[in-house]
């Protein structure tokens, strides 16, 4: 059977009518990882329609890092969560109306979750948009919008060592110099694979 890929991200992009100074009252650092999953949370349950009200949401403010990432007196905020593989029939099974409804529902649930850290967040929103795993697939060409190459699910392990790098292919002089050369992938996997490729070529 085909190897499973890692879960994709759902990301909400917000433009806020709130200064960086005011935002920093709630977010002491630009990147916040609250660990507050609710009962019933299961990253492997693709049929849970209420998944986004149970998951933890990370927050990142680009404008707290660089104020030029928002107009003066305003701020930018990203909310992000890993999503079960092919959630809700892969976001509506190709039906654009269902896709839009699921996207809006997920967006509102994540904004509600972030409001526990930033009270009244909804009232400050001037702009909002979101990216689903299908969005990431369209722009990155990663299968199913995979966030870090292959699945991190320990039950779907296919490399002997999750941290090992395998750049070899059946094709002579063709090597894998990307995150796909390691089970857990990501930036560390891509760097390790590129390093191994350079060593092999030299």
Segments (PLM) and residue ranges:
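C-terminal structured subdomain/cap of oxidoreductase catalytic cores
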Residues: 1-3, 7-21, 74-76, 82, ...
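Mid-domain catalytic core of redox enzymes
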Residues: 1-71
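Composition- and surface-driven signal marking solvent-exposed, interaction-prone regions
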Residues: 26-29, 71-75, 92-96, 126-127, ...
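Flexible loop/turn segments at secondary-structure boundaries
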Residues: 20-23, 66-68, 85-88, 133-136, ...
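Charged, low-complexity, helix-prone segments enriched in Lys/Glu/Asp/Gln
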Residues: 1, 44, 99-106, 136-140
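Glycine-rich, aromatic-lined ligand/substrate-binding cores of catalytic
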Residues: 55, 67-92, 96-110
